[in-house]
Curated annotation (Swiss-Prot):
Keywords: 4Fe-4S, Iron, Iron-sulfur, Metal-binding, Mitochondrion, S-adenosyl-L-methionine, Transferase. This is Lipoyl synthase, mitochondrial. Its cofactor is [4Fe-4S] cluster. It comes from Picea sitchensis. Signal peptide: none annotated. It is found in: Mitochondrion. It holds the Pfam family LIAS_N. Its EC number is 2.8.1.8.
Amino acid sequence: MSINPAFLRRITWGSKSLHHQFTRCQVRALSSSVEQTPESTTPALSALRERLANGGPTLSDFLTRNLGEEPYSVDVGTKKNPLPKPKWMKAAVPGGDKYTAIKAKLREMNLHTVCEEAKCPNLGECWSGGETGTATATIMILGDTCTRGCRFCAVKTSRTPPPPDPNEPTNVAEAIVSWGLDYVVLTSVDRDDLPDQGSGHFAKTVQKLKQLKPKMLVEALVPDFQGNSECVQKVATSGLDVFAHNIETVEELQRVVRDHRANFNQSLEVLKMAKTYSPLGVLTKTSVMLGCGETPAQVIETMEKVREAGVDVITFGQYMRPTKRHMAVSEYVTPEAFEKYQKLGMEMGFRYVASGPMVRSSYKAGEFYIKSMIEDDRKKASSSSI
């Protein structure tokens, strides 16, 4: 079944038409999932489906409940007559002592951050410390040039990027430790030009960090490694605490949003492999952009498939066009709609869901929750082994 995104943008979150479209699509998605993968269904999803089968509230009921006539999204206008961004999409201007210190340290160590390369709107908040006072930066390793060209990403691309710096794992680890952080996110460009896709370099960086500061929690936001199981295993067993890989968008929009070498099923398999190879206690995580032209029903179906893959944490954020050369924004999803996805995600059994217009996959707001989850898991594991 196909739902016109323009139609969904015009109608309200709580309308009968949207409820009808949701119900038809979600029943098809749920029934097919139950038939195809019953052994992989999580307890939370099983309970949710049982309620549906027994005439309980549908997923569309869950999403539309209490929103009344609140809109699902705000239009962006046309190319000739663009509308202004909604007030909730206004980002703070970068500044402050911590921001200046981190920027200087990065230049001194010749390090790259995805914050700058991808023009992240949260750069000012994360580097200055925001409400928590804890400054964070997501370090990008394996250089600043990607072998792929996704339509949403501002990182520069090349078929033959410069070779990785062999000293980078040590330089990155020493720089991060000098900042006194307790939680750090490492990410990288895609390196299809390397025999191991850069997985060995990634693993060395994690291992070096753990050697210098064993108690530091390390999240690795990795590429798909072309679905290579050996590469996934190498990183998953490197000593990290969170294995993250982003599916980026719903299955129907993969070829529109991502490079042709990436696809939904390959990314889903990477997350499944990570869960299989990772030691007990390692969390898996993924992220989805909204506002690319997807429908709410497609988002729900994506959430189900991701949860069935055993993923622990999922984040949702608004897609923002980095430059005019990149894919245009289809709509601005409202904070209320993001909140509904957050509640539905928890209902489905995700251990943590970060969902908001300004949320990004490596956004600092979720680190405190994830850190607490990891520490609690380890305490339980330690007490049970006594």
